[in-house]
Amino acid sequence: VAQDGTGDYTKIQDAINAIPEGSRGIIYIRPGVYEENVYAGRKSTKNKYFSLIGEDKQTTILTSGVSRGKGNEDNTYNDCAALNVYASRFYAENLTIRNTSGNVGQAEALFTNGDAHIFNNCILSGYQDTYKANVGARGYFTNCTIEGATDFVYDGGMEWFDSCRIHLLKGGGYITAPAESGMPMTKVMYPELSADKFYPGLFFRNCTVTAADGVADGAYYLGRPWKETCGAMFIDCKLPKAINAKGWKDWSGSENKASLYEYKSIDAATGSLADVSSRASFSHQATDAEVEAYMNPKFLFAKYKDEPFDYEKILRGAAAPMNFVVTPNEISWESDDNAAGYIIYKDGAFLRFTTDRSLTKDAADDARYSVASVSRKGVVSKAVLASDALRITAFPTAEGFGKYATGGRGGRVVKVTSL
């Protein structure tokens, strides 16, 4: 997709709409600011899958300026969100997804309804309600930045944030506002639990919480419980002085049943374990036993739904290009069977997205070409410089992927670009 007309489409939504039933569309998006209110599927979508790959997360931006604040009460979260994900098994990489409304009330940037979504190396930016999850869905976020001020990760479902940056904007507020868990756990069934009931929901592991300049000490809470049967948990996370000593805020009595947990929180200033002696009485410090037994995405995703969600396998992607052959007029390479396409760079800049395993060039062309593989789910490998490539062994994967009738190596690749 490219707004300047150099791609197959100028709008992301048009590229999504072009994906046929029974296939996955891998949509490559060139840098630009796309103000579209994008829908990756609808409630009726059952057999279409989407991967959105941005060229660079800092410059490839899906944006919205719509809010549900004063004067806009008729708007819904769907109207506000720059991206609404209804299709299952959605994948996004190298994108900024934002709402620029500011401190005017609810204004989502991202809403996910489809199950088994993955966001890799993305930025979610807003003020209030930046990211809205949904009960019944599982999601995995890795190496992402999520920023906001009020309840900016909220609602139900089973969402896991690994090695992410959680950024607190100037002012004060709450990181999370969890709602219905959808999977209550009891000590009878899960004996390592430290409480009689546990409501898993929003999990943050190995995340770093940072604060903007001017945020006062103690101005933020880890969260507040929107509903009673809800949960949020911070595992091995670095916390700044901006986090209030109480950790968690009460909300109309919901806190007495909610599962608001921490495990080995770290003081970002010292690198030592954080002082949790003044934490709210309704919150919990998890035990080693329950964290080891239950508090990991593999276990919880499998318990939440029977349908497999192997996020680790998906994120491994395809093998990087290998076994390059360079002649005066052509560069060719190999990958494994999990590669759906390739991104070619010329002197470090994007040149094209292709399903071919070769590039024709002029004999006098002395540019440096590098190639990255794109997996069937849309995961981009490290780019390999053709002139420096070493011969390495490919390890094909058995994972299936529907082929598109017009050709290519599995799936339909749609190039999307912008200014």
Question: What function would you assign to each model-found segment?
Answer:
Residues 1-330, 337-346, 353-388:
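Sequence-level preference for short, compositionally simple segments enriched
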